[in-house]
Amino acid sequence: MGESSFTVLRDIGSLPLTENEEIRFSIDVYRGFRYVSVRRYLQTDGFAGPTRDGLTLTVEIIRVLEPKIAALPDDPKSVEDGQLGKFAKRQGSCVVVAIGSFKGKRGLALRQWQDECGWTKKGIWLPLEHLKEIKALFRQTREALDEQPTDDF
């Protein structure tokens, strides 16, 4: 495998949103580093594949974020709006995770922040109505990361 190649190591699962739209969680490797990809996928007559909606999370972010998401109440109506945390991704960049509303629906927003320019276009919004599935996907991702890697990357 080349030094700069991108490889999906493991598909964790998906969160179906509509008949032709889903959010997929996967563990990937790029330039020798493992990370988690949370990305929206579409399947239409003219296009099938990943969209630009999504972001990558480091292994360390998942290990800290998953317990915070697991601790949220099971009933989405009892989850309070607010920031769950701000997690360093690399120097000058972090991921901000918050509960909020968008277009009349509540969700879990994961957005990237750059110190020099503010919010970037990288991010994903997970509908809170799927909180049970969201918790399970983050737990399964953390468990998969805790397993010993079988691939040399």
Regions found by a protein language model. Give the residues of each.
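Positively charged, low-complexity terminal tracts
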Residues: 1-153
